[in-house]
A protein has these predicted regions:
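Conserved alpha/beta-hydrolase catalytic His-Asp/Glu region
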Residues: 130-132, 136, 151-209
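Catalytic active-site module of serine/aspartate enzymes centered on a nucleophile-bearing elbow/loop
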Residues: 241-271
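Short beta-strand/loop motif that positions the catalytic acidic residue
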Residues: 211, 217-219, 223
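Active-site loop/oxyanion-hole signature of alpha/beta-hydrolase fold enzymes
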Residues: 42, 55-96, 263
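Flexible "cap/lid" loop of the alpha/beta hydrolase fold
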Residues: 110, 118-149
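Conserved HGGG/HGGXW glycine-rich cap/lid loop of the alpha/beta-hydrolase fold
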Residues: 19-64
Length: 271
């Protein structure tokens, strides 16, 4: 654990991890779908803990935050993050969002413009049609299949994630026990239910141009989950944006290309 941890469970039923460095603008880290704040950022947070303040939040149905079958969406997650930052007394911040986290980050930047100084979107998407999921019904069937699989073989998905981390040399030996335990704590049945309810219907194309924050978009040249052309749909709608592509990276940039990512974050945020 790279930083002090604070839970706001009594108020928001959300788990947060907060690190404070006096005189710095806090960076808010928003994780990917099916992960959590530590699972997504365990290779990033320890290396910047002396350079900047940060807050990492477990979003709904992920990590140590609450689990519920009630319908929720990206905008609700954005509202919760905004409320947490208000409770923490944060009036200006930088935000880093990966995949699903990038969707929440964009919503925050639209809803509360004075709050967001700079925005980093890693493998972002504006909607899940076109290049990736041309048939939403088919994706819903896929999500249903995965949910059934998780009930029959509850360890399958955590084992798959762990295998990927090991094969891609994303975790060193000292992290293996932690990674194994962390992955097996995920709320997979809830996570994949969310896929059908809020990931598929998400569509930000009509309002992305309202975002005013200076933005850095980071993509992976070999990303098969959110290909470059899908992220480019975000880029073309943003007003003030820079793009960095890691040619040999897939979707898991914070796991496989953490040093490249850290270089970009330090330069963009002037850490």
């Amino acid at each position: 654990d790279s930083s002090p941890s604070r839970g706001l469970g009594d108020v928001y039923k959300r788990q947060i991890r907060e690190n404070i460095v006096d005189g710095t603008t806090p960076v808010i880290f928003l994780h990917s779908w099916g992960s959590d704040s530590l699972g997504s950022w365990f290779k990033i947070l320890p290396k910047i803990k002396n350079e900047t303040s940060f807050v990492a939040i477990d979003m709904r149905n992920h990590g140590k935050s609450d689990a519920s079958w009630d319908r929720w969406d990206v905008d609700e997650n954005a509202d919760v993050v905004i409320s947490i930052l208000k409770e923490l007394g944060i009036s200006s911040c930088n935000i880093v969002g990966w995949s699903m986290g990038s969707a929440v980050a964009m919503s925050i930047a639209k809803k509360n413009k004075p709050l967001v100084n700079k925005l980093v979107l890693i493998t972002p998407f504006s909607w899940l049609g076109g290049a990736v999921y041309s048939d939403k019904v088919a994706f819903k069937i896929f999500v249903s299949f995965v949910r059934i699989r998780e009930r029959l073989f509850p360890n399958f998905n955590p084992k798959s994630k762990f295998s990927f981390l090991k094969k891609s040399n994303s975790i060193n030996d000292e992290y293996t026990e932690w990674a194994w335990n962390n992955l097996h704590k995920s709320k997979d049945d809830f996570i994949y239910a969310d896929g059908g309810r809020f990931v598929v219907p998400y569509d930000a194309r009509s309002w992305i141009q309202e975002i005013e924050a200076e933005t850095l978009v980071i993509t992976g040249g070999r990303d098969k989950l959110v290909p470059e052309e899908t992220s480019n749909d975000v880029v073309k709608r943003l007003n003030e944006v820079k793009v960095k592509t890691f040619p040999d990276a897939g979707h898991s940039v914070p796991w496989t290309h953490e040093e490249d990512l850290l270089t970009e974050l330090r330069e963009f945020f002037s850490l």
